[in-house]
């Protein structure tokens, strides 16, 4: 991420609308940005071609989309694919795509490490390193190869979702 720039990914429609109006842009620009972020899955503000060049330049001076590609993916013979994402805390989190006959599930993370230290889970053994932002949670869904075919998203990756309820609930609402 470019230093000093705020991230757009993870913001709600209301937050995007408030942001653009504070910059002197029309309210409908918030909806356009939301469509670019969450429907068209762009990686840069320059790709938002129905925004004027002046508005794209103004946004790009202060903001970045915030999408990041997985740093690694590993495919198993049953079709399950594990993705590894770098996050702002400097840690790494996993997302796992699980194909089935009539379903395509993505298991996503909500924290780097975990405080719970459950006996059956290795994540707790790593210790807790931080909560993911709503944007980092959403990025996992938008950035996997299979994202267009997903039928289910489950918060059963790294971390305890209810220990990061604010960002988890925001990621669901977006």
Can you annotate each of these PLM segments?
Residues 92-95, 101-174:
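Conserved Radical SAM active-site core
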Residues 1-104:
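Flexible, acidic/Gly-rich N-terminal and inter-domain linker regions that tether
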């Amino acid at each position: 991420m470019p230093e000093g720039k705020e991230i757009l990914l993870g913001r709600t429609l209301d937050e995007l609308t408030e942001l653009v109006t504070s910059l002197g842009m029309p309210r409908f620009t918030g909806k356009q940005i939301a469509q670019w972020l969450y429907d068209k899955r762009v990686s840069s503000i320059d790709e938002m071609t129905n925004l004027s060049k002046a508005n794209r330049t103004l946004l790009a001076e202060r903001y970045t989309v915030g999408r990041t590609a997985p740093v690694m993916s590993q495919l198993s013979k049953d079709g399950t694919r594990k993705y590894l994402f770098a996050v702002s805390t400097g840690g790494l989190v996993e997302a796992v795509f699980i194909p089935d006959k009539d379903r395509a599930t993505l298991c996503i993370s909500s924290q780097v490490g975990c405080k719970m230290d459950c006996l059956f889970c290795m994540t707790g053994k790593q210790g807790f390193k931080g909560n993911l932002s709503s944007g980092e949670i959403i990025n996992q869904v938008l950035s996997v190869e299979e994202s267009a075919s997903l039928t289910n998203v489950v918060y059963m990756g790294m971390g305890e979702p209810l220990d990061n309820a604010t960002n988890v609930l925001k990621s669901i609402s977006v």
